[in-house]
């Protein structure tokens, strides 16, 4: 059985994100993408447009001193959505993040048009980034 094409789309996205290849990310994110990062911390918010979304991504690496490290557990996809079961670790100002989370993407015309970052313990995530 072959993977759904949107599984491959996520794999390309993940490879570009983890290597900091924003040029490759530009190929998978719609110019009008919207990124939702819940919580009450310096990287929370609704980021409208690819440029704002990428700036939010960059801030994760900046604030963690480059230690932010996501790993993939599984990827589920259909024609309109991608759900990735994830885990992340990071260190910042003597604090450690070690937590599961879910990424949800809405896909249209082969591009990521909207995304959500959902953590198992948002309060701990807020404390880490604050």
What is each PLM-predicted segment?
Residues 1-31, 126-130:
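Short, low-complexity N-terminal intrinsically disordered segments enriched in polar/charged residues
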Residues 27-80:
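A solvent-exposed, acidic/Ser-Thr-rich amphipathic alpha-helical stretch
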Residues 29-30, 88-90, 103, 119:
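Short beta-strand segments enriched in hydrophobic/aromatic residues
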Residues 68-70, 97-103:
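Short, surface-exposed coil-to-beta transition loops
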Residues 78-88:
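A short hydrophobic beta-strand element
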Residues 90-98:
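Short, cysteine-centered beta-strand-loop-beta hairpins and adjacent loop/turn segments enriched
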Residues 104-126:
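Short beta-strand edge/turn micro-motifs at domain boundaries
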């Amino acid at each position: 059985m072959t993977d759904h094409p949107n599984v491959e789309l996520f794999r390309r996205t993940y490879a570009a994100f983890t290597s900091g290849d924003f040029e490759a990310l530009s190929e998978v994110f719609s110019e009008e993408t919207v990124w939702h990062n819940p919580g009450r911390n310096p990287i929370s918010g609704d980021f409208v447009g690819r440029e704002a979304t990428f700036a939010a991504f960059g801030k994760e690496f900046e604030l963690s001193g480059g230690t932010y490290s996501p790993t993939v557990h599984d990827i589920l996809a259909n024609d309109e959505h991608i759900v990735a079961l994830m885990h992340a670790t990071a260190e910042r100002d003597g604090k450690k993040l070690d937590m599961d989370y879910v990424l949800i993407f809405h896909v249209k015309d082969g591009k990521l048009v909207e995304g959500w970052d959902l953590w198992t313990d948002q309060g701990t995530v807020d404390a880490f980034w604050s």
